[in-house]
Amino acid sequence: MKKLAQLVLAATLGVTATYASADAISDAAMSDIRSEKAKARDEYRHPQQTLRFFGLKPDMTVVEVSPGGGWYADILYSVVKEEGKYVAAHFYVDDSSSDYYKKSVKGFKEKTKPGMKYEGAEVTAFDPMKALDIAKAGSADMVLTFRNVHNWYMGHGEEGINNAFGAFFKALKPGGVLGVVEHELPESADVEAMKKSGYMKRSYIIAAAEKAGFMLEASSDVNANPMDTADHPRGVWTLPPRLALEEQDRDKYLAIGESNRMTLKFKKPN
């Protein structure tokens, strides 16, 4: 009887922890820290479902690679700020960097100061060719990157991709999770399209992750969009929110919506 009671208690605690994590993600997604403009894109980016799929919990150390202006950071930081840690592996900048990169990093760091919305968050640097120490080795429970792999491939090819996934593997604890969301190129498409379209083949990303030592644990269709053919005049930027063709066929591309995206969960072996 005592053993049964212990099992029931353990199961109850497990369910409670799951609900607590879900509630933390939901609360963060609906928080006032996020602008209404940011929340409007939840229709396409599905942050709550995506982060639950990856297994985000409040006590985790989470590294977000290339967080940009902080669309996902608003949610991630809010979830882990009390019990865990948020690390932003932002752009690497030096004297030769563009003003955009410099301003982006400076603006993000300003938000980590006392009294600001990411107070206490850590900012590191990432570049697939110049800066690979995104966090202390073996310190992260989770590494996440959203719609960035195509940039590294277009800028640095296979070497850049291998360096990136190697850096993610190094930063994670054994058993840690790598979550990747990326614009998906059909497997039947010419591989050359990855060089300029902004879309990547799922098989290519899985192979790159496995080469670094990861195991594919699961995939999700939560960010899939079957209306997106991935064949557009200006690549993925033809679609919203960019709408690179501006008024040309605007209604057509708005009707398609944002891109079809793969959502992949990898694990670093124990």
PLM features per residue range, with description:
Residues 25-58:
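Class I SAM-dependent methyltransferase Rossmann-like catalytic core
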Residues 59-68:
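Conserved class I S-adenosyl-L-methionine
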Residues 77-78, 159-174:
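A short glycine-rich, Lys/Arg-flanked "PGG" loop and its adjoining helix->strand segment in the class I
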Residues 87-89, 175-183:
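Conserved beta-strand signature within the Rossmann-like core of class I S-adenosyl-L-methionine
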Residues 100-132:
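S-adenosyl-L-methionine
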Residues 132-144:
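A short acidic, Gly/Pro-enriched loop at the edge of an enzyme's catalytic core
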Residues 191-219:
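Conserved Class I S-adenosyl-L-methionine
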Residues 249-270:
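C-terminal lobe and adjacent flexible extensions of AdoMet/dcAdoMet transferase-like proteins
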